[in-house]
């Protein structure tokens, strides 16, 4: 007997028995089905649900496409006899089984009565969702919609931590993340816990930056959810110079990073529907430093909350706070960043929207996932699609002007290339291969761009300069000075722009677009994105020594400020504080914040802002409880140590330790922890009100505060 790892580093394993279809998958992380497809293995009959929730921001409980593959691709629904042949077995704790049922219910039975009761569609759209969803749903001989329980078998672990599958196969839980498969008289140990990366099965496309546009689209992925050759559906849409992520496929954060885009550079996310190949990457954006806007309809938003809460094992109310929900109307157009936006409900197995973006010169339509044209005609004949809905879809999808990105996934609930035969300015999505006949529209591949209005890259340069001057506190006239006197250079990925230890004050740098890593002694300490700066430290060091390596992660466009110009700028003074004084304060305080459990990983822009707000406090050995008890005050230990006394006993915090009323307890739940300095100690103090405001803007900080407050009780 042999248990096969999917890949040496992915944290899942596959067991194949002697009987056809007798297989077990241990672990179910994002896009694990694509690893199975790459190996040419059958979809597993049994899924052992993993104990981990996330690994390096990759969700671990993602059963959706494993379910679709087992039921449909393995032929476990008999369409002739209208019944399920074999049920997918899911093994886990009661809580895991509850979560996986929520995910499958809202994703597969997205318009079933039990789901509609939870997502509460408005009265105008509910009849359409009811009727169209029922038409797509598989039914038995009596015309009854096949319920989820007919497709899956939920199996809890036994009290002894084992479960017996069939006659001779037993799976046992060992240590955390470890199992044993016992079959055929043999035992095979399986360990899922590991420290490595969990990459996608496909190669992340590199070498191309997301160049700013006034109006256009940049394809991150357009493959379907089963194809292991590439990423699923995600696009960057530029709306009057604002960057919006349209749909959020698994590993979308990595696709963005390869294009030089961090989450903080997004102006928001727009979601068409909740299927995994369109939302599998959302979990990574639920705990980022910036609370992102999320545009969709109220029905789809409530579906997202249900699914994301189950994936992350959190409450619906909690995940709702990770994004700023912005309702997208479907009954009338709205305006977003100066662009006219018209959304409409598509015709799919779950609530889905198509979207049209339009300025005064051109238009761009995303059809959203939608049933094929012939199928829509048949639905009208069968009374499942109202004539007015059919007319609306024909106009919005097949007779619209401008560019069209069309679903051509070729299935019951997807469109077909022939639906757009002979049309110009149409591109196919949800597939990887263009039909041979040249009259069919081409397929969008990762990296393909459509520029409806390129605009001026110089305008983006000016925006980056303005953002940096705002941080520096420099006068407004410096914006034009830097634009005229600086040099613009572009660097490919892997370029070492400055090297630690070099004596060089030729330039200070502002990033117009792209992403850079900052390394000190070859250790990554920060990532820099557009609107951030580097190279200033050498000008503040009397020896002119560079204190870090800065390496381009993606193609990078830099505004290189000559040393002479930068030295003049350092002496600029606003409200009795020079730029040099502000930068020196940032360089002194930022490392303390950067190394703390609460603020590590925040964008450098946010760390700079906090550094300028903070001050330093020197305390000798003794009681500093009164200072620490002030409302919403936060301290970070820079040097020395303090002792905290809480309900869980004593604790000592050294350098980078965080304490204060905002982090050591939840307001009103427990009394403050007494705090005492153990030796001469230097503290960085953030003023009252800073932390609540930061937590409101940053899901990452909010979650960390909750974690720290529990630890310090």
Predicted segments with their positions:
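Active-site neighborhood of phospho(di)ester-bond hydrolases with catalytic His/Asp-centered motifs
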Residues: 26, 245-249, 265-277, 295-297, ...
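Binuclear metal-ion centers of metallo-dependent hydrolases, dominated by the metallo-beta-lactamase
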Residues: 1-37, 52-53, 331, 398-400, ...
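Di-metal (Zn2+ and/or Mg2+/Mn2+) metal-binding site signature of metallo-dependent hydrolases
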Residues: 255, 261-289
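Catalytic core of the metallo-beta-lactamase
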Residues: 330-384
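Metallo-beta-lactamase
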Residues: 138-165, 194-196, 203, 298-352, ...
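Conserved beta-strand hairpin/beta-sheet module of binuclear metal-dependent hydrolase folds
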Residues: 1-147, 152, 161-259, 352-373
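Active-site environment of divalent metal-dependent phosphoester hydrolases
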Residues: 226, 274-280, 302-303, 332, ...
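Cytosolic regulatory regions built on CNB/CRP/Popeye-like sensor folds
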Residues: 440, 451-713
């Amino acid at each position: 007997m042999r248990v096969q790892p999917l890949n040496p580093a992915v944290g899942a394993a596959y067991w194949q028995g002697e009987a056809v279809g007798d297989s077990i998958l241990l672990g179910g992380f994002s896009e694990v089905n694509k690893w199975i497809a790459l190996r040419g293995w059958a979809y597993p009959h049994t899924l052992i649900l993993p104990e981990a929730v996330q690994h390096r921001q990759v969700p671990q409980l993602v059963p959706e496409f494993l379910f679709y593959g087992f039921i449909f691709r393995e032929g476990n629904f008999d369409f002739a006899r209208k019944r399920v042949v074999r049920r997918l077995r899911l093994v886990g704790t009661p809580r895991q089984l509850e979560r996986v049922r929520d995910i499958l219910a809202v994703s597969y039975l997205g318009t079933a009565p039990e789901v509609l009761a939870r997502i509460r569609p408005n009265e105008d759209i509910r009849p359409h969702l009811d009727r169209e969803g029922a038409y797509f749903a598989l039914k038995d001989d009596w015309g009854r919609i096949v319920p989820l329980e007919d497709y899956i078998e939920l199996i809890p672990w036994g009290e002894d931590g084992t479960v017996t599958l069939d006659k001779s196969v037993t799976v046992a839980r060992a240590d955390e993340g470890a199992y044993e498969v016992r079959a055929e008289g043999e035992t095979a140990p399986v360990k899922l816990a590991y420290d490595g990366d969990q990459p996608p099965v496909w190669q992340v496309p590199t070498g191309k930056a997301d160049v700013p546009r006034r109006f256009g689209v940049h394809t991150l992925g357009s493959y379907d959810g089963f194809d292991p050759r590439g990423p699923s559906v995600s696009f960057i849409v530029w709306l009057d110079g604002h960057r919006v992520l349209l749909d959020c496929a698994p590993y979308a954060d990595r696709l963005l990073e390869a294009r030089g885009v961090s989450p903080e550079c997004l102006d928001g996310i727009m979601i068409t529907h909740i299927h995994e190949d369109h939302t599998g990457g959302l979990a990574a954006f639920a705990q980022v430093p910036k609370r992102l806007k999320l545009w969709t309809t109220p029905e789809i938003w409530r579906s997202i909350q249900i699914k994301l809460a189950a994936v992350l094992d959190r409450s619906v109310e909690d995940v709702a706070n990770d994004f700023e929900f912005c309702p997208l109307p479907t009954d009338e157009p709205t305006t977003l960043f100066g662009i006219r936006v018209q959304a409409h409900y598509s015709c799919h197995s779950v609530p889905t929207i198509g979207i049209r973006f339009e300025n005064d010169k051109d238009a761009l339509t995303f059809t959203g996932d939608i049933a094929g044209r012939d199928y829509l005609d048949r639905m009208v004949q069968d009374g499942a699609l109202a004539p007015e809905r059919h007319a609306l879809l024909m106009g919005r999808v097949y007779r619209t002007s401008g560019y069209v990105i069309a679903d051509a996934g070729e299935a019951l609930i997807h469109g077909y290339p022939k639906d757009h035969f002979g049309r110009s300015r149409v591109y196919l999505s949800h597939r990887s291969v263009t039909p041979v006949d040249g009259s069919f529209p081409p397929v969008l591949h990762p990296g393909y761009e459509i520029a409806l209005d390129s605009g001026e890259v110089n305008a983006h340069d000016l925006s980056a300069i303005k953002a940096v001057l705002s941080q520096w506190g420099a006068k407004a006239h410096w914006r034009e000075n830097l634009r005229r006197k600086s040099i613009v250079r572009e660097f490919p990925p892997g370029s070492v722009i400055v090297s630690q230890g070099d004596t060089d004050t030729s330039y200070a740098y502002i990033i117009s677009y792209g992403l850079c890593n900052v390394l000190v002694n070859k250790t990554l300490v920060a990532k820099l994105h557009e609107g951030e700066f580097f190279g200033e430290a050498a000008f503040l060091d009397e020896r002119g020594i560079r204190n870090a390596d800065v390496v381009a992660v993606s193609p990078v466009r830099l505004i290189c400020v000559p040393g002479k110009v930068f030295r003049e700028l350092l002496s600029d003074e606003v409200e009795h504080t020079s730029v040099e004084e502000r930068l020196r304060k940032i360089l002194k305080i930022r490392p303390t914040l950067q190394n703390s459990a609460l603020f590590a990983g925040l964008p450098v822009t946010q760390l700079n802002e906090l550094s300028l707000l903070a001050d330093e406090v020197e305390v000798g050995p003794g009681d500093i409880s009164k200072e620490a008890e002030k409302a919403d005050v936060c301290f970070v230990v820079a040097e020395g140590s303090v002792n905290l006394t809480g309900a869980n006993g004593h604790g000592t915090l050294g350098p980078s330790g965080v304490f204060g009323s905002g982090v050591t307890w939840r307001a009103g739940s427990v009394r403050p922890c007494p705090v005492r300095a153990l030796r001469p100690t230097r503290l960085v103090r953030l003023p009252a009100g800073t932390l609540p405001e930061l937590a409101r803007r940053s899901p990452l900080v909010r979650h960390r505060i909750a974690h720290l407050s529990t630890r310090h009780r």
